[in-house]
Each structure stands twice: as C-alpha cells, then as structure tokens.
C-alpha cells in the first residue's frame, strides 16, 4: 500500500477526522499501452490505465493540477476532466464538461481543478469530457471514505485493493472511431473488456488477468465502477453471494444478490464475504452492448478477473458461473431520505418530458433537436447575464429551471440509454419497464438507464449552476443526445451560492480560442 493511501485509510478510522486539502498532480500524456495485449497509443493520466486512484475523506477538498502534455496529432490534444458524481456547489466551473462548464485546456498548459467533496462520500470516478476522448484512456476511480459510515459494521476491508474498474477497450483510436460512426451510422464495437485495466481478445496473447486477493473469513467492500464508453456489465463472483449497499455515492439498504447490472458510469458497492474454501474464483463482468459479429476480436465473456484466497495456488480458476438473483430497482432503497431530491407524491413545480428520436442516424434528437455544443460555455454565458433560453447561443437545448423547485423529468422509452445528471442525484420515481410510481423510497442515483420503458425521476434545484443531462454512451453524447439545465441563473452571479471563478478558469477560453484547430 502506498504511504499516502495508508494515511487516508488511517484517518478514515478516526471519528474526529479534520478536513484537509489533498493535492494530486496529474500529468496527461500520450503513451503506448497494451491492456489486452494489443499495443496502441493512449491518452492517460501519469502514464497508466486506469488513471491514478484518488482517495480522500468526507469533508476534504482536492487540488488537482492538470499538466497537459499531449503531443499526438492522431488524437485530441486539448482536454477537460469531469469529476463524476460530485455536486460542485459553488464550483460549477470545475465540473469539467467542455463548452458547458469550461473551455477545453490547451496542450502545454497547466490548469488546476479545485473543489470540496463536502458532505458526499462513496464511489465516484473521473474522465475526459471532451468529445470521445475518454475512450482513448483518460478515466480513473475517485473514492471518498466516510469515517462515520452507518454501514461500516457490514465489512472489514475497504481500501485500494477492493476498487474494481470495468471498461471496454478499442484497438482503433477514438477520433477515427468517431469519424467511422458518423459516416456509417454504426456505433463502434469494442475489441475487449477489461477489469482493473487487464483483459483479453479473441486470438490475442494470454495477458494475465487482474487479481483481487482476499483472506478467508474477512468481509470486503468491493467498489465496482463502470468506466465504459458504451457497454454495461453484469458483475458476479463465482460461488459467492454479494450484498449490495451503495449506488452512485448513495448508500442503500443492504440486499443480498448474486449479480448486479452496472451501466456506463454507474457505481455500486457490494460486500463479499470470503467464506468459501481456499481457492481461485472467477470474477465475471460479461458485457452487453457491442456485437461480436461486427468485430471478431470481441468475446464478451472474456471480461474476467481472479478472486484469489490467501494460500491458493497462483493458477486460473476452474469455477463455473451459476446464474442467481439479480439486483432489481424495486429492491433499492436509500438509507437516508433527505436531499438533494425532495420526495412526495404531490405535483412537481416543473414537469419536463424529453422525447428521444433518431430521424437522421447516427444523430439523436431530444424533442426534435440535436444537442450542439456552444462555442462559449453555458456557465460563462449565465455569469455574463443570461437569464432566459433566448439569451444563450445556441438556445435550443438549454432548459432554465428556477431555484428551490421540484423538477420532474419524464423520458419515454427509446433504446438503452444510461442518462447522467450533473450537479445532483435524482430519485427514480418510475423505473424503466415498471408501471408503479414509488414516491416513498425510490432508488437515488446520478446515472439511470432508459431501457425501452418510460422513466421518471425527480430532483430539487438547490445547487445553482450549468448542469449537463446526457446519455453516458459516449458515442451517443457525441451524436447529440443531451440537454443542459441552467439552474437558478441569477444565483450563480451573486449571493451565498454564487460561483467561484478562479483566474485560470477565466483564462481557459482565450487560451483555447488562440490555438490552431489541430491542437484543439
């Protein structure tokens, strides 16, 4: 264990933890990696995939100098990073989406992200939010420990060894894949699936699978993160039950299951009791999304890792998967019912219906309009005085919502789209493919899939800012499947919730606009 991580975990065991500012230096570089045995150029943090693991405690602030050292002319050289799941109260400019919250950061510059995790804790992640850049490798885990976790009695071990990332991997570079997608209308198909940055593809070398080490009798909190651009994963461990306890940074009532579906950008914590005979067991995360007929390299069942008991031989498992109970939305109930969502079966203050269509494939429309990024970030336009949709350019997919209001969003079913709301969690009061509203104790998340049935969620506008709502299949976002909420515009400019705007954030747009297109 690295010393810095050990100090974080020791602090997490002390009830009187003092909030600290923790600094993580990020060098963003192009390097050649072969996570599945096929070597290719990448865009990665500190030369590794997944990127550097961030571990902090509840109440901490983070300071992350991002040194953009990208040089490859075959991939995007500017960048922005989204810190997925954090509310960013008063720091909407640090949220990361290009042209919503900031201009991209040019190459050969340093920009420092600074924000507080405040009262949030749980499992988060970070990734590029410029075009489809994170599909080239810029993605990593971000964990916030709670020294007073009300479910702490359920597990013994919760450290860097129990963080599990699920990803797909492409042998083609993201800009080339995007161009092919736009010209053919066919979404790119991944070559392999990775667990903790390791995997295999059909006909490729037998690269070692990742190993999660356990000791018999201990209970492990596995923090499982889908850092994928497209597919979802069905996570299970052979011969072991799992106790679900967290979704997207929100702790829920414990539920015993055998497997969990985890969509792009979703996170779950599950407790694994190492109570089986000392041996090796397959950790499985087969992918849904991506047709092997379109890419012979792909074997969706090769998304594997090894659970290895202390004392077991260092060999691959021979265990067999036995299907069992899958976690259901109807079983997910937050342990706390206070904000940011406001529950109740009364009418919302504002109702919004988002109708998805694809009349001009591969591009998507919402209510007849495809999202196109503005040239000036939405947040900057709000801070410059925009108070109505007609004040923003382009204005078509900007939804202005007043402060302290209950917003209800209804999305009629149209394909499998994991929608992510920035700046908030939301309460899923009508789950996809369900016909019963739950206003008492619905799941609370920041990513939820629209799976062919009407989905309705509610959130409360207590956090002024510019907040993206978009499909987290990155190819779909690039094809226009998004809107932006401009929340409480006047409160962004002045008052106790006004935005903090550091000088280096204000400098981003002039710096970006001054560089040649090839460096953008």
UniProtKB/Swiss-Prot annotation:
It is an enzyme of class 1 (oxidoreductase). Cu cation 1 binds at residues 82, 420. Binds 4 Cu cations per monomer. Its cofactor is Cu cation. It catalyses: 4 hydroquinone + O2 = 4 benzosemiquinone + 2 H2O. Cu cation 2 binds at residues 84, 127, 472. Residues 1-19 form the signal peptide. GO terms for biological process: lignin catabolic process. Its EC number is 1.10.3.2. GO terms for cellular component: extracellular region. Disulfide bonds join 103-509, 135-229. Keywords: Copper, Disulfide bond, Glycoprotein, Lignin degradation, Metal-binding, Oxidoreductase, Repeat, Secreted, Signal. Cu cation 4 binds at residues 417, 471, 476. Residues 21-145, 157-305, 375-488 form the Plastocyanin-like domain. One of its GO terms (molecular function) is hydroquinone:oxygen oxidoreductase activity. Cu cation 3 binds at residues 129, 422, 470. It comes from the Eukaryota. Glycans are attached at residues 108, 239, 299, 492. It is found in: Secreted. Belongs to the multicopper oxidase family. Lignin degradation and detoxification of lignin-derived products. This is Laccase-1. It comes from Agaricus bisporus (White button mushroom).
